A protein has these predicted regions:
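Membrane-interface "cap" regions at the ends of multi-pass membrane proteins
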Residues: 1-31, 35-40, 44, 53, ...
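Helix-loop-helix junctions that connect adjacent transmembrane segments
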Residues: 3-4, 42, 116-128, 146-272
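Small-residue-rich segments of transmembrane alpha-helices in multi-pass membrane proteins
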Residues: 17, 21-25, 151-165, 224-232, ...
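Transmembrane helix-loop junctions in multi-pass membrane proteins
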Residues: 26-30, 104-107, 136-142, 266-267, ...
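Hydrophobic transmembrane alpha-helices that form the core helical bundles
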Residues: 32-36, 54-130, 134-138, 152, ...
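Transmembrane alpha-helical segments of multi-pass small-molecule transport proteins
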Residues: 47, 114-140, 151-163, 196, ...
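TM-loop-TM module centered on a large, flexible mid-protein loop between adjacent transmembrane helices
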Residues: 74-81, 113, 222-284, 303-342, ...
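A generic transmembrane alpha-helix motif of multi-pass inner-membrane proteins
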Residues: 360-418
Length: 418
C-alpha cells in the first residue's frame, strides 16, 4: 500500500497552520478579549504565545521524527501502545458532531450579514460549504495549502489596510505599564484566547505530506504560530483603537463595523468574504485532518474501504465518510435547533485532553531539553483543564468510556488483542 502524496512545502505549511489557528477566531476573539480585559489584552497575546511555545515545540519535534497521518494518535501509540492510540484517535473524531457544525454556523453567519439569509438559506450555505470542502479535498493537500495561503494573505492585508486607513501609530497603542497590569483581567483574557491556538493537533496529521517533513514541518509550525499570534495582536489593537467591542455588540461584528466606519457600507462585503474564507480555511484543515486520521486508523485492514487511496494518493473514501457525518450532524442540529454554546466548551475540553496526551507521549519519546518542554507543556494542559472547570469531566468521561468500551482487536502478526 502506497502512502499519502508528499507535496507540501514550507510556505504552504505556514498557510495551512496560520489559517487553522486564525479560523473562526480572528473576527471574534480580539473583541471578546478586549471585553473581559480591556487594554490588558495587549499583554495577554505575547504571554499566551510564550505559554503555548512549549506545546508547539513538542508538536514540532514529534512531527519531525514521527511524521504520520495519525497525528497525535500516532505519537501516543508510539509511546503507550496501539490501544491508547485508537482511543486517542476516536477521542479526536468525537468532536465532529459538535465542533464542525458550530463552525459551519459561524461561517454561514457572514451570509446572513451580507444577504439577510435565515433558516433554510443558512442551512443551504452550510451544506454548500461542505461541498466546497469536498471539492478542495479531492484535489489534494497542495490545493488546500495554496488556497489557504491566499486566505491568510487576505486576512493580513485587511488588518494592514485598517491600520493604514485608521492612522494607527505605535505611539497610539494603549499598552498598560507592567506595574499597572491587572492579573485578574489578564487571566480572564487568557482563558478566552487559548482557543485561538487550538489547531496544532489538526496540523500534525499533515506532517507526512511534507516534501521534507524533518526540515519544513517544525519551521512551518513555529512560523505559522508566530504569524497567527501577530495577526491576533494586530486585530486587538484595532478593536481597542476604535472601541469596537461591548456587551451589546456581537463579537464577530467588530471588524466589519470598523471596515464600514473606515471604507463605507460598500466595503462590508469585503470583510464578510474574508471572514467566511477564514472560517472555511479552519473547517477545511480540520476535515482534511479527520479524513487522514480515519484513513490511518483503518490501516490495520489494508483492504478496508476506508483504508484505500485514490489514484492521486488522496484518502477520498475517508473524506467522504467524514463529510457524511458532518452532513448528518448539521441536519440534525438544524432540525432540533440545538444550542451549541455549552457543547463547544465540552469539545474544547477534549482538545486540551488530546494536547495533554501528546505531551505525555513527548515525555516518553523525547530526550533532554525537549522532554523537559513536554513536562512543562503537560503541566500547562493540566492547568487549562482546571480552567475549564467541571466541564472538563466530559473529556475525562469520554476518554475513560472509549478505553472501556472500544472493542479490542487482534493484531494479524501475533494475535495479541489491543
Amino acid at each position: 500500500m502506497s502512502g499519502l502524496k508528499q507535496e507540501l512545502g514550507l510556505a504552504q505549511g505556514i498557510g495551512l497552520l496560520s489559517t487553522s489557528l486564525l479560523g473562526t477566531g480572528v473576527f471574534a476573539v480580539p473583541a471578546l478579549a478586549a471585553l473581559v480585559a480591556g487594554n490588558n489584552s495587549l499583554w495577554a497575546w505575547p504571554v499566551l504565545i510564550i505559554l503555548v511555545f512549549p506545546i508547539a515545540i513538542v508538536f514540532a519535534i514529534l512531527g519531525r521524527h514521527y511524521p504520520s497521518a495519525g497525528g497525535v494518535a500516532h505519537f501516543v501509540g508510539m509511546a503507550f501502545g496501539s490501544r491508547l492510540e485508537r482511543v486517542t484517535g476516536w477521542l479526536f473524531l468525537s468532536v465532529i458532531p459538535v465542533g464542525l457544525p458550530a463552525a459551519l454556523q459561524i461561517a454561514a453567519g457572514f451570509g446572513q450579514a451580507m444577504f439577510g439569509w435565515h433558516s433554510w438559506q443558512l442551512l443551504l450555505a452550510e451544506l454548500g460549504t461542505l461541498a466546497l470542502v469536498w471539492y478542495i479535498g479531492t484535489r489534494g493537500a497542495s490545493s488546500s495549502a495554496n488556497l489557504q495561503t491566499v486566505i491568510v494573505g487576505l486576512i493580513v492585508a485587511l488588518i494592514v489596510a485598517i491600520w493604514w486607513a485608521g492612522d494607527i501609530k505605535p505611539a497610539n497603542i494603549p499598552f498598560p505599564a507592567p506595574g499597572n497590569i491587572e492579573l485578574t483581567g489578564l487571566f480572564a483574557a487568557l482563558s478566552v484566547m487559548f482557543w485561538c491556538f487550538v489547531g496544532l493537533e489538526a496540523f500534525a496529521h499533515l506532517a507526512s505530506e511534507f516534501k521534507n517533513p524533518e526540515r519544513d514541518f517544525p519551521r512551518a509550525l513555529m512560523i505559522g504560530l508566530l504569524l497567527a499570534g501577530l495577526v491576533y495582536w494586530g486585530c486587538t489593537v484595532v478593536v481597542l483603537h476604535f472601541d469596537a467591542y461591548g456587551e451589546k455588540m456581537a463579537a464577530a461584528a467588530s471588524l466589519p463595523k470598523i471596515v464600514v466606519q473606515l471604507f463605507g457600507v460598500g466595503a462590508l462585503w469585503i470583510a464578510c468574504v474574508i471572514g467566511y474564507l477564514a472560517c472555511f480555511a479552519s473547517l477545511n484543515i480540520y476535515i482534511q485532518s479527520f479524513a487522514r486520521l480515519v484513513w490511518s486508523q483503518a490501516q490495520h485492514n489494508p483492504d478496508h474501504y476506508l483504508a484505500r487511496l485514490s489514484s492521486r494518493h488522496i484518502p477520498n473514501n475517508a473524506l467522504n465518510a467524514v463529510l457524511g457525518c458532518c452532513v448528518v450532524s448539521t441536519l440534525v442540529i438544524h432540525a432540533l435547533e440545538i444550542n451549541l454554546d455549552a457543547l463547544i466548551i465540552y469539545a474544547n475540553g477534549i482538545f486540551i485532553m488530546i494536547y495533554l496526551l501528546c505531551m505525555l507521549a513527548g515525555c516518553k519519546l523525547l530526550q533532554g531539553r525537549y522532554r523537559l518542554l513536554a513536562v512543562v507543556g503537560g503541566l500547562l494542559c493540566v492547568l487549562l483543564l482546571a480552567m475549564v472547570g467541571w466541564k472538563s469531566l466530559y473529556a475525562l468521561i469520554m476518554l475513560a468510556g472509549l478505553w472501556l468500551l472500544l472493542p479490542k482487536r487482534k493484531t494479524p502478526e501475533n494475535g495479541i488483542t489491543t
